[in-house]
Each structure stands twice: as C-alpha cells, then as structure tokens.
C-alpha cells in the first residue's frame, strides 16, 4: 500500500513537471515576436516585414523631414543613423514629439512607408529609453546629454 502511494506521488510530480514545461514552451512561442520592444530602422530596411505584420519601430525623428499635411496627417523619417524609414501618421502627436527627438511607433510597413497607428515620444528633454540608446550606440551614434533608464 505504501509503495503505491509513493508511486502515485511520483507520477503526479512527473505529470506536473511536464505540464509546467509544456506551458512555458507554449507561452514562449506565443510571445516570440513581442519580446523586442521595437526594431531599429536599419533592421527594418535590411529585412522588411510583410505588410500584414504589426510591429514597433524606434529611433530619432530625422531633422528636416517633419511635414504636416492635410488635417492630422504627419509624415517624417525615423533614423538610427544607419538607415532611415519614412513614417506616415494620422492623429495627434505627443507634446514632446519633434525633429531630433526619440520616438517609438506602432504600425505596419506598406510600400516602404511605415504607417503608424500610435506614436510615443520620450518623457523629457534628457530622457531616452534604454533600448533606443543601445540601438543608436550599436550603430556608432552616441546620444550625449541623454539620461538613460536607471541613471540619476
């Protein structure tokens, strides 16, 4: 009798471990595309996603490219200083959005233009998300004067 209880306990532990492993693998598989907060323009230019894929792009708003069109339509280029991607956005921009400033946009790449549905700007004149800073530094650009996450 005692041996059966021990054997049953071991079976339950094995089933629980397999279930935990399987659920972890499935969650990881489901989140595989969402692990990166954004893609830098150089990565998007090198390996363009299909028009059906919604993703985030992040970098700096290129100087001299911000154009306000009819109504609420705005066009500009986002750059990581290795590549530049044209962006089109219809809506109200964040207050801190401007040329030479950091941004992250959500949308799709259609015919070489990123059609944004959401634009996020950095918090203040000295803040830049760590991911944007790392991507810019990886391209050889050092955004001096910007505080990073965790800096005081």
Curated annotation (Swiss-Prot):
Record field: transmembrane: 10-30
Keywords: Cell inner membrane, Cell membrane, Cytochrome c-type biogenesis, Heme, Iron, Membrane, Metal-binding, Signal-anchor, Transmembrane, Transmembrane helix
Positions annotated to bind heme: 123, 127
Superkingdom of the organism of origin: Bacteria
Predominant cellular place of this UniProt entry's protein: membrane
GO molecular function ontology, one term from the record: heme binding
Keyword rRNA-binding assigned: no
Subcellular location per the Swiss-Prot or TrEMBL entry: Cell inner membrane
Membrane topology: Single-pass type II membrane protein
GO BP: cytochrome complex assembly
Residue ranges annotated as Cytoplasmic topological domain: 1-9
Annotated InterPro entries: CcmE, CcmE-like_sf, NA-bd_OB-fold
GO cellular component: plasma membrane
Signal peptide (from-to): none
Segments on the Periplasmic side according to the record's topology features: 31-152
NCBIfam families xrefs: PRK13254.1-1, PRK13254.1-5
Chain's role: Heme chaperone required for the biogenesis of c-type cytochromes. Transiently binds heme delivered by CcmC and transfers the heme to apo-cytochromes in a process facilitated by CcmF and CcmH.
Record family assignment: Belongs to the CcmE/CycJ family.
The protein, known as: Cytochrome c-type biogenesis protein CcmE
């Amino acid at each position: 009798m005692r041996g059966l209880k021990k054997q049953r306990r071991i079976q339950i532990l094995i089933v629980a471990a397999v279930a935990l492993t399987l659920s972890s693998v499935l969650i990881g598989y489901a989140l595989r595309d969402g692990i990166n907060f954004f893609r830098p323009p150089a990565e998007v230019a090198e390996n363009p996603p299909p028009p059906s894929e919604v993703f985030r792009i992040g970098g700096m708003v290129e100087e001299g490219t911000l154009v306000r069109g009819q109504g609420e339509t705005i066009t500009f280029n986002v750059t990581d200083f290795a590549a530049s991607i044209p962006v089109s956005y219809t809506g109200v921009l964040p207050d801190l959005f401007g040329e030479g400033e950091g941004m992250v946009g959500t949308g799709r790449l259609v015919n070489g233009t990123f059609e944004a549905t959401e634009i996020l700007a950095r918090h203040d004149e000295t803040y830049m998300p760590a991911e944007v800073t790392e991507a810019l530094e990886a391209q050889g650009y050092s955004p001096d004067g910007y505080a990073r996450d965790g800096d005081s």
